[in-house]
């Protein structure tokens, strides 16, 4: 579902992945990420969690979420309804290999 200025009334479901990358954003809606494969770290509100295949991580509406995968993570994301408020992309970073 492409973004529309008026928002959306139903949850939106999509797949995404990180490969030795970090992504930080802020959404006006709740965001749930189900880890399909790999290892994902999520930091929001001063709390960091580590998630593996089968785990779900929730970032509340309005909160900044930072997501990173030291090697690889494949995710299924669910965005809650949105009344048309914009999301903010706060940063992307390629992680260095050690």
Give a label for each model feature.
Residues 6, 22-28, 44, 68-69, ...:
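Short histidine-centered beta-strand/loop micro-motifs
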Residues 6-13, 70-98:
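Double-stranded beta-helix
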Residues 9-28, 60-61:
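Conserved short histidine dyad/triad with adjacent acidic residue
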Residues 17, 26-42:
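Short, conserved beta-strand element in jelly-roll/cupin
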Residues 26, 34, 51-53, 69:
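Conserved strand-loop elements at the edges of beta-sheets that form or border functional pockets
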Residues 32, 39, 64, 72-74:
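Structural motif
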Residues 42-43, 59, 65-70:
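Short beta-strand His + acidic residue motifs that chelate non-heme Fe in jelly-roll/DSBH
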Residues 46-62:
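Short acidic-glycine-tyrosine-enriched beta hairpin
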């Amino acid at each position: 579902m492409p973004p529309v200025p008026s928002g959306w009334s139903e949850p939106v479901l999509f797949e995404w992945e990180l490969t030795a990358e970090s992504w930080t954003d802020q959404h006006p809606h709740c965001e749930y990420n189900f880890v399909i494969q790999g290892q994902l770290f999520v930091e929001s509100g001063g709390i960091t969690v580590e998630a593996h295949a089968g785990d779900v991580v929730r970032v509340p509406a309005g909160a900044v979420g930072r997501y990173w995968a030291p090697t690889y993570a494949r995710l299924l994301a669910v965005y809650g309804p949105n009344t048309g408020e914009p999301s903010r992309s706060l940063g992307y970073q390629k992680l260095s290999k050690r």
